[in-house]
Amino acid sequence: VKNTGLVEVPMGTTLREIVFDIGGGIPGRKKFKAAQMGGPSGGCVPAQHLDLPIDYETVKEVGAIMGSGGLIVMDDSTSMVDIARYFMEFCQDESCGKCVPCRIGTKRMLDILTRITKGQGKKEDIDLLKELAEVTKSASLCGLGQTAANPVLSTIRYYLSEYEELINKKDTQSLPQESQTTQT
C-alpha cells in the first residue's frame, strides 16, 4: 500500500477501507490480489472479500484470523503458492517440536510447497496438503500448530488454479517475486 504504518480501526471497518482509504491503495498500476490477515499463521483473503467487515467471526468465516492484527497486502504480481510457502517456512521454523502434528505436519507441508514452487509438484499434493493441514490444525497442542495451516488452506481455497498451474507445468519454476507486499 502507499501509506504503510500502524493503524487502529474500529471493529466492523471493511478491508477495502483499510487498504484503499487508509492505506492509499496499491502503488503503480498493480491491482489488489489478497490480504494476509492475522500474522504469519493468518489466512489470505482475496479481492472478492474487500467489503468484509473486520471482526472475529467474519474474518474466521473466510479462512483468516485476527491474530496479531497484522495485515500484509499483496498485488496481482504475487504468487500465492510462494506466499503459502513463505509463511509455512516461518511457522515450521517457529514450531517448538513438542507435539508431532505440528513438528511433522508443518515440515511435510513445507516440503510439498517447496516441491510445487520448484515445478516438481504432483496432482495428489493438493489433497495431501489439505489432509496434513486439517490434522495439524485439529491435533496440535498450541495456537501456532492450530493456525499454522491457515495460509495453506486459504490459498488452496481461493487460488487453487495457481497450485494446479504450477503442478501442471513441470518446466515452470516459481521464484519469489519482487512484488508490492507491504505490512499495514
Regions from the PLM with identified roles:
Residues 1-184:
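Redox cofactor-anchoring modules in respiratory/redox and cofactor-processing assemblies
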